[in-house]
Amino acid sequence: MLEVKDLHSFYGAAHVLHGASLQVAPGEVVALLGRNGMGKTTLIRSIMGLTPPTVKQGDVIWKGETITRMKPHDIANKKIAIVPQGRRLFSSLTVTEHLTMFKSARATEGWTIDRIFSTFTRLGERRHHRGNQLSGGERGMLAVARALMQDPELILMDEPSEGLAPVMVQHLEGVIAELGRTGLGILLVEQNLYSALAVSSRVYIMETGKVVHSATSEELAKDEGAVQRWLGVHG
């Protein structure tokens, strides 16, 4: 289980996280919602040990071990993977070469390239295409697939559906839901309320650097008006 306890993170002198706390259990898909600038990406980066920001108070605990302030490489070796914003790819490498590069040296089973291509059928069709030949949706799928090749037990996804066409969003939602059923824990940063409710079992809502509400997706689905007010969504 991932436990984040009272985390305070800073960008220089700017206090960005103000005591954020949450949990992700094995096989649980947890959505982290909030408007831009509320600290969602900062929280993801703090969990993964990426700098900036700088964590000055609080703890990140993974499977009973405190990993706060560990180096990102050491955290990745704990079988935690990240799908960051930006979807940066190597323009000269093919889809297959990207996956081979990210294959975990520790893994003896789990995610293979064949399994990736059966899960992400579009990537299979484009396996020989280079990074600069992929659409935005295909790049997003490849970013998720690369993380899976590390054979993680927990994956942190920072707005993986951003900029995707509706058909690609629907496909990604199906993949995320299926991953949760395999026992993979997922912390999913989202701004799309409906995507979050479609795949998650629990939702945390962030505002000004802290978690201000937590509920099951079923509970929030019954109180959509309240969620829209919290997120500043109208209409």
Model-predicted regions and their roles:
Residues 1-235:
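Glycine-rich phosphate-binding loops of nucleotide-dependent enzymes
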